[in-house]
Amino acid sequence: CREGRYGQCMGGGGWILGNEIDGTQAEYVRVPFADTSTYPVPVGTSDEELLMLADILPTGYEVGVLNGHVQPGDTVAVVGSGPVGLSAIMGARLFSPAHIVAIDQADARLDAAKLFGADTVVNNAHDDPVEVVQALTDGLGADVAIEAVGVPATFELAVELVRPAGRIANIGVHGAPVTLNLERLWTRDVTITTGLVDTYSTPTWLRLLPEHHVDVARFVTHRFSLDDFIEAYDVFSRAAETSALKVVLTRSA
């Protein structure tokens, strides 16, 4: 905690809400260690904008963009265009990369990726993203490959996308072992990072929102009242069919 690595706090800290204790879909919520996780709301921000800070934007930004050390002029490949992948695209755009390539198998999410700042989109169900990235980089590969899905195939794709001396930033939450081809990675000086979000970037995003430097409201694709709770969850669970990104529930009047 003293190092600002709040996701790894010892003695009862770290990832608590929705993990070790119940989440926040309740009338009242007790927030442990609130000094490191609550912030005053700036004037000029909406509730929907603030929802995106808990925690897709810090996740894509910290675990993807900052861990990947995105630099001006980089070519960045983002594997997965769900809300966290889109957050990584939005965050990467702040660093003026030369090119951002978004990769997904859902055309609706690739359309969203264009709105969030991707220069090129690739549906890897039909096209080879490795060929696309190599064509953009004279055969070198991406400076940074960000994995935002969490399955073995997408991590292995990130390995294929990255250039020698490049960086792979893994955001995806993996539930199964992944093959790590070290015999190929170590000779190419590839750096791999992983991690939980620490949300230390939340103050940065809170400064950006009132000035409209980023448009985070576009994450919200569906809105429901709490009376339609079950329908809202059904829509979100079928995101590939419904084109849902983020679903907002509001209390009935």
Language model: regions and residue ranges:
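Glycine-rich phosphate/adenylate-binding loop and adjacent beta-alpha elements
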Residues: 1-38
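Rossmann-fold dehydrogenase core element
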Residues: 167-169, 179-219
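Glycine-rich cofactor phosphate-binding loops and adjacent beta1-alpha1 units
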Residues: 67-72, 95, 111-191, 230, ...
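Conserved acidic E/D residue at the C-terminus of a beta-strand in Rossmann-like folds
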Residues: 104, 172, 196
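Mid-domain Rossmann-like dinucleotide-binding core that forms the NAD(H)/NADP(H) cofactor-binding site
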Residues: 43-127, 131
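C-terminal hydrophobic helical "lid"/dimerization subdomain
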Residues: 156-160, 199-253
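Structural detector of well-ordered beta-strand residues that form the stable sheet scaffold
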Residues: 77, 101, 167-169, 193, ...
